[in-house]
Curated annotation (Swiss-Prot):
Modified residues (Pyruvic acid (Ser)): 261
GO cellular component: plasma membrane
GO biological process, one term: phosphatidylethanolamine biosynthetic process
InterPro entries attached to this UniProt entry: PS_Dcarbxylase, PSD-B, PSD_type1_pro
Site residues, Cleavage (non-hydrolytic): 260-261
Keywords: Cell membrane, Decarboxylase, Lipid biosynthesis, Lipid metabolism, Lyase, Membrane, Phospholipid biosynthesis, Phospholipid metabolism, Pyruvate, Zymogen
Name of the protein this chain belongs to: Phosphatidylserine decarboxylase proenzyme
E.C. numbers: 4.1.1.65
Functional note: Catalyzes the formation of phosphatidylethanolamine (PtdEtn) from phosphatidylserine (PtdSer).
Length: 294
């Protein structure tokens, strides 16, 4: 696990942090969601082109490489990739990374505490919406957090074959989750809106969490569709068994963000060993090795 001495923010950085607390997070997010759905023809194509240029989006790996082929910004943002754009590691003892992005944090869960960033830890119980029994399953386990920037591919995939046990929607804040704010806003990942997916796998119980953020207009899964909006003020839980059981294969798409955010994976103690090439800030891609079976 990575941890280093935390630098004090500058005056302008403190203003940036303060703005996160006072800005109308929900209204900005709703407005962004509405705008991203609009189909304005050449205006939409121009906006997409500007965005792709600013963030250096690699359009050659997308199924549709031309900006004019996207009717809305949302359609562009969750663009599928060509079939050969991501290679899924075929080693049966390996779990794969679920998303493109950068490693934000990773390592050992100390009892029921995860490292968020330099100088900040947060409670596993808080992250799991107060579910103490579920949290106990991951005491002394392993975790990995991936930050998806605006330029990244925003569909989320499965690290391994799995059976969905339950899904939990947790209402919360909509702070930005970029690396700077992740370092300076306490408990950020346990405060933000999120969708918790609990899976049974040959590697033990695995949790994969989609964390929302400012202007993340919606999160979706392949089995339930769009989870939010509408946004609930209460925690919601769905269980899956029998006829409603959901089976997913390694590398299969399981969800998506409409605008960027964060994915967190949790593994039980003594079940997996995180790959030694992982490091904070390192860019990663879907299908690369995340961990190996112990």
């Amino acid at each position: 696990m990575y941890n280093a001495e935390k630098k004090q923010p500058t005056y302008w950085q403190r203003l940036k942090i303060a703005f996160q607390y006072v800005m109308p997070q929900l209204y900005l997010t709703l407005a962004a969601g509405w705008l991203a759905k609009q189909k304005w023809g050449s205006v939409t194509h121009f906006i997409i082109k500007l965005f792709a240029k600013k963030y250096r989006v690699n359009m050659q790996e997308a199924e549709k490489t031309e900006f004019k082929d996207y009717a809305s910004f949302n359609e562009f943002f969750i663009r599928p990739l060509k079939a050969d754009a991501r290679k899924i590691d075929e080693n049966p003892t390996a779990l794969c990374l679920p998303a493109d992005g950068r490693i934000s944090q990773y390592g050992h869960i100390e009892q029921q505490t995860l490292l968020q960033a330099k100088g900040h830890s947060f409670s596993l119980v808080d992250l799991l919406a107060g579910d103490t029994e579920l949290a106990k399953e991951f005491e002394h386990g392993e975790f990995a957090t991936i930050y998806l920037s605006p330029r990244d591919y925003h569909r989320v995939h499965m690290p391994c074959d799995a059976t969905l046990r339950k899904m939990i929607y947790v209402p919360g804040d909509l702070f930005s989750v970029n690396p700077f704010l992740n370092e300076h806003i306490p408990n950020l990942l346990a405060r933000n809106e999120r969708v918790i997916c609990v899976f049974d796998t040959e590697f033990g119980t695995m949790v994969q969490i989609l964390v929302g953020a400012t202007i993340t207009a919606s999160m979706s899964t392949v089995w339930a569709g769009i989870i939010n909006p509408p946004r609930s003020a209460e925690v919601k839980e769905w269980t899956y068994s029998g006829e409603s059981a959901v089976q997913l294969r390694k590398g299969q798409e399981m969800g998506a963000f409409q605008l960027g955010s964060t994915v967190i994976n949790l593994f039980q103690a003594d079940k997996v060993e995180l790959a030694n090439h992982l490091d904070v800030g390192v860019p990663v891609r879907v299908g690369e090795v995340l961990a190996y079976k112990k």
